[in-house]
Amino acid sequence: MTVDFGRVLTAMVSPFDKNMELNLPMARKLARHLVDSGSDGLVVCGTTGESPTLSKEEKLELFRTVVDEVGGRAVVVAGTGSYSTKDSIALTQAAEKLGVDAVMLVCPYYNKPSQDGLYQHFRAVAESTNLPVMIYNIPGRTSINLLPQTCARLAEIGNIVAIKEASGNMDQATELRRLLPDHFHIYSGDDSMTLPLLAVGGKGVVSVAAHLVGGKIQEMINAFTSGNITLAAKLHSSLFPLIKGLFMTTNPVPVKAALGMLGLNVGPPRLPLVEATEQEKEKLRVLLREAQLL
């Protein structure tokens, strides 16, 4: 299976109202805004979408809403992975019925499976669906690192077609590209690593910063792919302060605050995350002004 998700996918936040319930009208508005401002696709209910705090029913509501709003205009990738293989299969199959274009499966967190356990988990979920699958490796959150050799085994499964690589290790990214077939796409899971990953054969990024600067990220990637490395590096440097600022505390706390400042009231995060402090908000305002967004 050969699939092109595009270059810039936004890891979309999950909007909440004042009662901390899903704000589906805002989810529609945000999805439209992201696609209109440069996103090729949206990843719904991933880390940035606070997936662990959402019930299965809430996740399905978000999948349904985003597909209805931007399906056909952008790729909709449903975050259906968890530490339970059985639950991941059930959510994946339910998401498929709603018309999502693909699923993203995070490495099982907390229970720390072996490399063979990771392989068996991803294979079982992939074999339960006809959808293309993107694997999500983020050892800083899951405490387990999917090794390139394991990913290469998984790439032999027909519908496992991409990885969101957020190890932050360029040696690992290089080894992934060396071992994986050309049609298997590698996406950066860290905005600050997008340009370095492109340099070793990456496809694009699953981005937090694209909530705010999706067009600029597209411009940077286009500059790189057209051979204008100097311009790509200049754009990377200009985006870097804002990108780092969006991780001054746990994601998605800063990006939710920033969206609110720009008139997209997506609400605060659910507990156990808490909203940005006044000091953090002031730092964000400065960064948004410097980026000419405020």
Curated annotation (Swiss-Prot):
It catalyses: L-aspartate 4-semialdehyde + pyruvate = (2S,4S)-4-hydroxy-2,3,4,5-tetrahydrodipicolinate + H2O + H(+). Homotetramer; dimer of dimers. The gene is dapA. Pyruvate binds at T48, V206. The keyword Isomerase does not apply. Its EC number is 4.3.3.7. Catalyzes the condensation of (S)-aspartate-beta-semialdehyde [(S)-ASA] and pyruvate to 4-hydroxy-tetrahydrodipicolinate (HTPA). SMART domains: DHDPS. Keywords: Amino-acid biosynthesis, Cytoplasm, Diaminopimelate biosynthesis, Lyase, Lysine biosynthesis, Schiff base. The active site is at Y136 (proton donor/acceptor), K164 (schiff-base intermediate with substrate). It is an enzyme of class 4 (lyase). It comes from the Bacteria. This is 4-hydroxy-tetrahydrodipicolinate synthase. It comes from Desulforudis audaxviator (strain MP104C).
